[in-house]
Amino acid sequence: RKLLRNIAISWIMADILNMANKAVFFDRDGTLNVDVHYLYRPEDFQWTPEAVEAIEYCHQQGYLVVVITNQSGVARGYYTEAEVQRLHQWMNEELARQGAKPIDAFYYCPHHPQGKVAAYAKECSCRKPQPGMLLQACQEMNIEPARSYMVGDSPRDVEAGEKAGVKGVLYTGGSLLACVRENID
């Protein structure tokens, strides 16, 4: 009996030590912010209704918050990766100004098959609906897909999530907080 108890304790400890995180992955344009096509400047940024509250709610429920976004404007030559990164930094600064916790990570795909910038003009596994960004985030951040969600305004967002083993949630406008509360455990 003592041996069985020790084995059970070992299994429990292994589970505790290997516990994976859960996450809510958000698409950016059209989900967290109003889609203005090829957004890269903070002065053009506008949160969707109750997006800040949705981010904060996810944190309160114990989820990591991760942005997963296609940024084909890089491949098209409209803006640079540095400008994408500056906007993401600004988003977290804006969250802090509003008293909210920051987004835990940003993953973006700069590629597009018809891009004008040769280095980015290609097919890839990261551009949604492919699951590459989600799979990379799960690996790098120790996220368990089965306990996680992908929230986006496009069927390709939901498809990318499902291909990665993540539950997809289609955001159709209105309060992002209401969408999250209705669909996320």
Locate predicted features.
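Substrate-recognition element of Asp-dependent hydrolases with the DxDx(T/V) motif
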Residues: 51, 55-91, 102-112, 161
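Short glycine-enriched, charge-decorated loop/helix-capping segments at active-site entrances
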Residues: 37-46, 80-82, 120-124
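Asp-based, Mg2+/Mn2+-dependent phosphohydrolase catalytic module
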Residues: 16-22, 82-104, 113-150, 154-185
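Acidic active-site catalytic centers that drive phospho-/nucleotidyl reactions
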Residues: 27-29, 70, 153, 157
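Active-site neighborhood of HAD-like aspartate-dependent phosphohydrolases
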Residues: 16-66
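Short beta-strands and strand-loop turn motifs
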Residues: 35-36, 67-72, 152
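Leucine-biased recognition of intrinsically disordered, low-complexity hydrophobic segments
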Residues: 3-4, 17
